[in-house]
């Protein structure tokens, strides 16, 4: 049972109703009261503090409190049933049942007290029904002799039925899909057909971006393509770190999604194609349509990089995390850095390219659903309605050069922290839409947003998404950079050919035409299990650019092999075998003792 009063805050009461009875019973019983209070507080502490759950999933920067909850629940429920079955203390059971009833009633009242929660009344009724069954069974088991004889089996049967019937993670409308739903409703939007069609046309190694949302973040796994999003409770630390450094803000480390955020960033991750839903008008300066399948239009990324590219310059990692999103993208084009190590000094120093700034403040035309005042202090909007925004048309000349890389910079003065959005139009768009929008937060401390945007923009719209007293646009400008000066052309022309990937093995022909070493960045996320060979000789795999694999390439043409193997696999298999053997020996000994007693 999960109480969820706010979208990002969940209070977990229990996975099974039986746990509430167990805790209530041990709290009421004098002999176990102190231990129950201590262990319950300890369980809550372990759930809140991520250390234990991170240890349980063996992944740094990832945690899953459910593992800890389920383990403690199973232990508490088992001890509870054992104690009730052995002692048959009617008074303690009755008092514990009363306390459990009070706790559950208070929990339900708490859930229903929040107006922003739409409680699933059907599931709430089923929860109450199972609670009553447990209550009658536990109280009756200590008072009725015939019921007492089948008490453990009866409780186990009800527990199994509860876990099957209440296949929902919460009392609100967030259900787990069934097999039939997966077949008819989920992962059935044409993406699989488009991916199969594209694979028949181009079987090289690449990632695919999407302009639309499918049912789940693990869409790529289910529909057969290498995507830019995932939802896993055990995301590797390198992926979590990379997304925290470069990706948009998400609910938790379990969610990773780069779709539609930054086409240059996606190119650096090996993205070569974009799937667009019906009617989607991709920015023509960035994407070229190459086919249709499954009701989707397939676009080729004009800025795609080879799946593996060479850096000849290096950054110092210190301070890079404080840069704006725009500058972070520019640093990734112009050079690499070691994620957890100091600058080597073996490469030429990288630097940001020169920029040209063009103000858009004079392009403002109108304000919608708010009042606007335009003076020397900026553009101030007040009296915000349901969808307040300011429109900047006629900006196509500022984004017309395909040989430049463009970014937007917006500086605000706000009465309080707010959510913002910048919509953009490109040629062929009939209006602003959710297909082309950047969302972000503006605070009094962090009042500037900067981001890479595509060429070919014709109009812009700035939205204030939160009801506040006022918002002032202090500065709104285009930042442009010569594409060659950014370092993009160097990466694009990297001598990385004959790329292939199968059975966790990446192979490529890499030509370093300089007299110095270069750093090959392969856009796989770094983990301890990666190993590399150059012309058959083993070399080090480095963690670069906050989580990608890096291999130092000497001068000349080389055959590079990058292979992944699960670390400590042999040790894990050995420990499993030893554990099974110990279990068999202990179990056999107990069987032998019981057999002797029967004889």
Which positions does each model-derived feature cover?
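Soluble catalytic regions of membrane-associated enzymes that act on cell-envelope
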Residues: 150-363, 415-420, 451-453, 461-469, ...
């Amino acid at each position: 049972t999960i109480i969820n009063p706010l979208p990002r805050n969940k209070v977990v009461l229990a996975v099974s109703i039986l746990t509430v009875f167990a805790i209530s019973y041990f709290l009421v019983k004098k002999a176990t009261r102190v231990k129950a209070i201590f262990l319950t507080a300890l369980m809550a502490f372990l759930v809140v503090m991520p250390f234990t759950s991170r240890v349980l999933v063996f992944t740094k920067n990832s945690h899953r409190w459910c593992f800890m909850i389920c383990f403690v629940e199973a232990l508490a429920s088992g001890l509870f049933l054992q104690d009730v079955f052995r002692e048959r203390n009617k008074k303690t059971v009755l008092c514990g049942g009363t306390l459990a009833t009070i706790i559950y009633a208070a929990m339900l009242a708490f859930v229903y007290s929040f107006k922003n929660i739409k409680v699933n009344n059907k599931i709430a009724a089923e929860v109450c029904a199972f609670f009553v069954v447990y209550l009658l069974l536990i109280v009756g088991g200590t008072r009725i002799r015939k019921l007492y004889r089948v008490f453990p089996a009866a409780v186990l049967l009800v527990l199994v039925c509860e876990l099957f019937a209440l296949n929902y993670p919460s009392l609100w409308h967030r259900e787990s899909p069934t097999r039939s739903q997966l077949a008819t409703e989920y992962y059935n939007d044409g993406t699989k057909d488009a991916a199969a069609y594209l694979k028949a046309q181009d079987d090289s190694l690449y990632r695919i971006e999407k302009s639309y949302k499918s049912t789940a973040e693990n869409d790529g796994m289910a529909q057969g393509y290498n995507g830019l999003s995932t939802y896993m409770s055990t995301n590797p630390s390198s992926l979590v770190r990379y997304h925290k450094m470069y990706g948009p803000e998400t609910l938790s480390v379990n969610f990773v999604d780069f779709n539609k955020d930054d086409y240059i960033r996606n190119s650096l991750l090996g993205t070569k194609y974009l799937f667009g839903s019906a009617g989607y008008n991709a920015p023509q300066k960035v994407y070229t349509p190459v086919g249709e399948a499954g009701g989707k239009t397939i676009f080729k990324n004009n800025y795609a990089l080879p799946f593996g590219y060479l850096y000849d310059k290096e950054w110092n990692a210190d301070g890079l995390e404080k840069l704006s999103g725009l500058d972070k993208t520019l640093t990734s084009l112009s050079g690499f850095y070691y994620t957890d190590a100091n600058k080597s000094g073996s490469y030429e120093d990288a630097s940001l390219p020169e920029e040209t700034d063009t103000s858009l403040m004079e392009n403002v035309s109108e304000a919608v659903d708010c009042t606007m005042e335009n003076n020397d202090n900026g553009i101030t909007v007040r009296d915000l309605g349901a969808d307040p925004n300011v429109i900047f048309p006629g900006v196509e000349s500022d984004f017309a050069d395909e040989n430049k890389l463009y970014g937007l910079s917006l500086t605000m003065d706000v009465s309080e922290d707010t959510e913002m959005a910048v919509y953009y139009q490109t040629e062929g768009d009939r209006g602003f839409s959710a297909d082309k929008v950047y969302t972000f937060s503006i605070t009094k401390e962090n009042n500037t947003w900067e981001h890479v945007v595509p060429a070919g923009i014709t109009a812009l719209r700035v939205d204030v998404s939160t009801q506040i007293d006022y918002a002032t646009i202090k500065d709104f400008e285009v930042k442009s950079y010569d594409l060659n000066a950014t370092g993009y052309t160097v990466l694009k022309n990297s001598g990385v050919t004959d790329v292939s990937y199968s059975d966790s093995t990446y192979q490529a022909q890499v030509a370093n035409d300089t007299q110095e070493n270069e750093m090959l960045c392969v856009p796989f996320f770094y983990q301890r299990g990666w190993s590399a060979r150059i012309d058959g000789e083993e070399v080090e795999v480095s963690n670069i650019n906050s989580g990608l694999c890096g291999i130092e390439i000497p001068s000349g043409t080389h055959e590079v092999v990058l292979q992944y193997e699960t670390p400590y696999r042999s040790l894990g298999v050995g420990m499993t075998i030893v554990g099974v053997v110990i279990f068999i020996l202990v179990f056999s000994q107990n069987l032998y003792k019981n057999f002797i007693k029967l004889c």
